[in-house]
Each structure stands twice: as structure tokens, then as C-alpha cells.
Design a protein with these regions (language model features):
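Conserved SAM/SAH-binding loop
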Residues: 130-136
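Core SAM-dependent methyltransferase catalytic element
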Residues: 245-273
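Rossmann-like AdoMet
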Residues: 1-84, 88-128, 140-144
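Conserved beta-strand signature within the Rossmann-like core of class I S-adenosyl-L-methionine
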Residues: 148, 172-187
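A short, conserved alpha-helix within the catalytic core of class I
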Residues: 157-174
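Short, glycine-/aromatic-enriched active-site segment of Class I SAM-dependent methyltransferases
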Residues: 192-208
């Protein structure tokens, strides 16, 4: 399938899907999403232009696994839940989790991405072709049921003001639930510059689109939105699967138990509303 018409920001969805596909081909996969490999095989694209380094691949796979676990847990408690995937891209989480019939799953992304997603993935979710930066994306989603909102790989590409606006849109529309997303801790301008330099030979590096400066204190979003309450801060680096990371990243995983700044560099945050 030709995806050359996708914009640079829309093409960031290709990186995460390619990382999940690459993980599925590993001797000891972390996520093991073979649907991702099948999706990538259908796409006419030079994936070597992406910054899918040996360190990025397991981090993407493990954060997806951790989000899946939290979504499954929410559905187990609320079999009538609404699940909302923000910036869904080509993520096949709905297929990995296979929710019961009482659950309604909504995948939100830009119209061109949703059109491509529908052509590639045999899912039964509800597509929402809309920009998260526009107020109307929640209009077609039920507001009166327990809701699990999650975002995998989205927040880094937004300005802080956009993140705040999206969080307010979530708590203003849905009656109750949880929002979960992956986070990288504070990311300075120097960090972002180093990332761009390190991937300079890649024509489609996510560092070129990185906007969010992040935050150290996981309670920071509570100051943006009084309806949010921190539920969980879980480091990706401290999971047992970190033993499968490549050498340097594996060492960082061990150090993360002693150095909080390292633990914050890859984490899953959950907030109740």
C-alpha cells in the first residue's frame, strides 16, 4: 500500500508500528505482535529511513505491552467500558486485547491515517477521523460509561498547551475513567538536539517532530487539570523484560533502580478522573 501521501507528522505512526513488527521477529519478543509484522508487510515504504534503533524497538514494544495490561485490567473491572485510543496510528491493540462485545473501542487519528488504518487492519473498532487539536473529536464517543483513554507515542509530538487542552477535553466530556500514556520525563532542548544529531542520517526521525518538553514530577498534570488524580507511575526501565534489552539499555535498566532520573526516561503514567 502506498503511504507516500502521508505528511511527516502522520508518518510517525509508521515508526511505532515498524518497531512492534521488528520486536515480533525477535528470538525472544517482548510484545510479540505478529499483526504488526503483517501490517508492515503490506506497506510500500522504505522503513530503513526510520530511526528504529536496537534500543528504540524494545522500549516501544514494552510500553505497548504495559499499556495493554492496564487496558485489560480496566476492561476486567468494567465489561461495558469505552476504550479510546488517541493517535491510534496503525496500533493493533484492539486485536491484541480482543475486548468482549460489551466494550466499545474508538480509534482517533488524523483522517489520512484513519483511512490507511482501515485499509490495513481487520478491526471492529469505531474509527474517529479527526484532529485531537480540534474540539469536536469527542462528539461521537459515548460520555456516560466507564472510559479508558490511552495514548501510545503521541504526547511527545504535541506542545504542552495541546496536551493540557486534550486532557481537559477528556475530563470535560467523559463522566469517569482513567487516562494512560507513555512519557519520557523532562526533555530539554539539548536532549532534543542530541536526538536529532544522533539520527541525522535518517530522513524520517521522530526527533524532528518532537515538541513536548515533558516534566519530572508525575503529579504535574494535576496542576493543569483539577479533575485528574495520579493513579500510577510505572517505569518501563524497571520491568523484568528489561533483561531482554541490548547491552547499554540493559545497563540503564539496572541503574534505574538507583537513579530516579533514568527510571523517568521511559514510564507509563495513569490518572483517574
Amino acid at each position: 500500500m502506498d503511504v507516500s501521501g502521508l505528511t511527516s507528522i502522520e508518518q510517525t505512526a509508521l515508526l511505532t508500528e515498524y518497531c512492534r513488527a521488528t520486536d515480533s521477529r525477535a528470538v525472544h519478543p517482548i510484545l510479540g505482535d505478529h499483526r504488526a509484522a503483517a501490517t508492515v508487510a503490506q506497506i510500500d515504504y522504505d522503513f530503513t529511513t526510520l530511526a528504529a534503533t536496537p534500543s528504540v524497538v524494545p522500549l516501544v514494544a514494552l510500553r505497548a505491552k504495559m499499556l495493554d495490561e492496564r487496558i485489560r485490567g480496566f476492561i476486567a473491572e468494567h465489561p461495558d467500558a469505552v476504550v479510546v485510543d488517541l493517535g491510534a496510528g496503525f496500533n493493533s491493540a484492539v486485536l491484541r486485547i480482543d475486548p468482549p462485545s460489551g466494550v466499545d473501542w474508538y480509534s482517533v487519528d488524523l483522517p489520512a491515517v484513519i483511512a490507511t488504518r482501515q485499509a490495513l487492519l481487520p478491526t471492529h473498532d469505531h474509527p474517529v477521523p479527526a484532529s485531537l487539536l480540534e474540539p469536536g473529536w469527542t462528539d461521537a464517543i459515548p460520555a456516560d460509561r466507564p472510559t479508558m483513554v490511552f495514548a501510545d507515542g503521541l504526547v511527545a509530538f504535541l506542545d504542552e498547551s495541546d496536551v493540557i487542552a486534550i486532557l481537559r477535553r477528556v475530563t470535560g466530556h467523559f463522566a469517569s475513567g482513567v487516562i494512560a500514556f507513555n512519557d519520557y520525563g523532562p526533555v530539554s532542548r539539548l536532549n532534543r538536539l542530541v536526538g536529532r544529531v544522533a539520527t541525522a542520517r535518517k530522513t524520517n526521525s521522530p526527533h524532528d517532530q518532537w515538541n513536548f518538553a515533558g516534566f519530572k514530577d508525575a503529579r504535574r498534570p494535576e496542576s493543569w487539570n483539577p479533575d485528574l488524580a495520579l493513579l500510577e507511575e510505572a517505569s518501563v526501565m524497571q520491568r523484568p523484560e528489561a533483561a531482554l534489552f541490548p547491552g547499554g539499555l540493559r545497563l540503564a535498566g539496572r541503574l534505574s533502580h538507583r537513579v530516579p532520573a533514568i527510571a523517568r526516561k521511559a514510564r507509563i503514567l495513569q490518572y483517574r478522573f
